[in-house]
Amino acid sequence: MQKRRNERTSPQEENEMAGAKPALFDQPRFSSLLRTSTLGRRLAWHESTPSTMTLADELLSAEGNAAHGTVILAEQQTAGVGRRGRSWISQPLGNLYFSLLWAPLLPPGGDGIALMPQLVRLNLAASVAVVRASHDAGIASARIKWPNDVWAGEPTPRKLSGTILNFDGKSAAVLGVGINVLQQMEANATATSLSTLRASLPAEAHVPPISREAVLATFCSELERLMSSTTEAVLNEYREHDLLRGRTIRVHHKTREQDDPSDFDALVLGIDDQGYLRVRPLNGPKQGDEISLSGEEVSITPKELTGGGDQGEPAAAAAPTDAAAPKKDEL
């Protein structure tokens, strides 16, 4: 997809459009754009690493809760792993691949159970923060596909971002995020990027040039804002940007490619207060009932939308995770 140079085209986008290697992440510029008190104030940048999640785990082991708020970012991951062991595609194409350490201090004698409400809020807030950052970049169509993907584009939304959240079972969590920013996507691709979507905006749209530094700075600012609010407030914002409510989905108990007798179609009613997906089955033994689904147990495909693939398939920069009550190691 070619994009006409205009006032909305950044030098990073011009490099991508010309087929040149994307410029490396500008750390001083990111710092100048950051409006947080903690999140992102410490940034560890790597040109290439097997996995930012592994580096984050190592930092937590070495520093514990002192590492709270650190962002570990890589231009490329060579062995990224998403939910359920799926591949996390992360080539050096001008996207954002990073892990953020969330390590709040616990009261004396506290344990991981006390952190569950906060972790549920973090899981939901991450998707909202991606949506807010996408809107700030001029992509108003960005919405959340339960549990933690962000899709964007009209009339057929496609996968733009995904997250995964790992909890150590004690006092810390690592949030892994992938956002397609500068990579130019083909029209028939199952994923999209902020740059690709902006190419279709009308000429009169007044949006600033896109940059990875600005997207990450906005994400950190929004996540810090959301995590300082209540779970109810985060749920309300998540629901405001819900892509699936009122749509028909296919519920898969294995994968989209592997049919299972227990699979069924359902109407999405929304998410409950724990982040589970509320649906009304349209066929099968529970037809007509209202039930809740966990992203740890099922995957879903919106039947009216065909551009973004099954939840968790490596179509975009990252794989999603369960938005329900977190569990140790894989949420």
Residue ranges of model-derived segments:
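SH3/SH3-like beta-barrel fold
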Residues: 276-282
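N-terminal lobe of the biotin/lipoate ligase/transferase fold
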Residues: 2-136, 203-206, 306-315, 320-331
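Short, acidic (Asp/Glu-rich) active-site segment that either coordinates a divalent metal cofactor
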Residues: 170-205
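Conserved, helical-rich catalytic subdomain that frames metal- and/or nucleotide-binding sites
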Residues: 199-264, 304-313, 326-330
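Acidic (Asp/Glu) carboxylate-rich active-site/surface patches
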Residues: 126-170, 177-178
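A short macromolecule-binding patch
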Residues: 285-302
